[in-house]
Amino acid sequence: MAQENAAFSPGSEEPPRRRGRQRYVEKDGRCNVQQGNVRETYRYLTDLFTTLVDLQWRLSLLFFVLAYALTWLFFGAIWWLIAYGRGDLEHLEDTAWTPCVNNLNGFVAAFLFSIETETTIGYGHRVITDQCPEGIVLLLLQAILGSMVNAFMVGCMFVKISQPNKRAATLVFSSHAVVSLRDGRLCLMFRVGDLRSSHIVEASIRAKLIRSRQTLEGEFIPLHQTDLSVGFDTGDDRLFLVSPLVISHEIDAASPFWEASRRALERDDFEIVVILEGMVEATGMTCQARSSYLVDEVLWGHRFTSVLTLEDGFYEVDYASFHETFEVPTPSCSARELAEAAARLDAHLYWSIPSRLDEKVEEEGAGEGAGAGDGADKEHNGCLPPPESESKV
């Protein structure tokens, strides 16, 4: 609640209107989208490996157990059928009879022999003889198929274990985004950090604005995506993420927030999705971390608290202050109005020396121009920074 009050200026007529907007991307990076009424489910089977990797762990383990158990049962049944078809089960006590598999006296024995064959743990007193060509062919088929099942299932488990999803959990985003002046220009900023000592290689950052819009033809687009520039043209989107960094989106004429003042921003309805990508240094696999900011998570007139201090021979990062912000003097007008006010201020500096005739005309029109001047001053004052405050969030 303190954060919400800090974002509200006492000079405003009313606090920002709260909304129950449904997130498109959760704060932990999960995409809040479910695929429904998928009729062509056979497409999942065409990419069975990815389907198994994407399954939940309990389902993956269940499939892992079933894959081995069913193959053992299947080949065990075939071994039993071979013994039954050859009449081996009817000559169990006949020492002169040469069976296909020695000491295979029932289905349980055939099942155990199937396990011994596929897992290559070694035969005991059950062993195949050279008088059974169909058994030799089946032995070769089970050995080949067993190797394929092992490769497939072990590969699935390895990929599932080594997925970089957990690595993304140690990439953190600030709980709020802020809007304040940087080098005299309004900027939308958020902070990212890496909790691990091993770094993300080739890290890059992207930001997208998610909001609804209506086209000139009347088409309604509920989740229209717009890129927010975070330094693609200058290379600032390529990060050396050793310590926490503040990512800045300059609100210029190409920004969708160019005409958004503080009050307009608080009344707007949007979601900012931020995406951090890079390669895990230990494995070389691509990792992606995501987060998002709703309207009430964007603090106007705030700046992030510094978390980096210089100690004896090293820099120390204090993650206890990672999400903290503090208020700074920031204009409440839009970036466009701020640029226009700055342009008018620069124009006064280069005003030419008027002639006597111009002075006379100005004296005659002094009364008429007073009202317009007051209006311009009011407009300019709307872009002045608010009183400085030291309250922290």
Curated annotation (Swiss-Prot):
Domain free text: The PDZ-binding motif specifically binds the PDZ domain of SNX27: the specificity for SNX27 is provided by the 2 residues located upstream (Glu-388 and Ser-389) of the PDZ-binding motif.
User: Where mainly found?
Assistant: membrane
Q: SUPFAM superfamilies of this UniProt entry? A: E set domains, Voltage-gated potassium channels
Name of the gene encoding the protein in the UniProt record:
Kcnj9
> So what does this thing catalyse?
K(+)(in) = K(+)(out)
BP GO terms, sorted? regulation of presynaptic membrane potential
Non-traversing membrane segments, not crossing the membrane: 107-118, 119-125
Q: Which residues cross the membrane?
A: 58-82, 135-156
**What is an example of a GO molecular function annotated in this UniProt entry?**
G-protein activated inward rectifier potassium channel activity
Which loops or segments lie on the Cytoplasmic side of the membrane, by the record?
1-57, 157-393
Would you tell me the protein name for this molecule? Answer: G protein-activated inward rectifier potassium channel 3
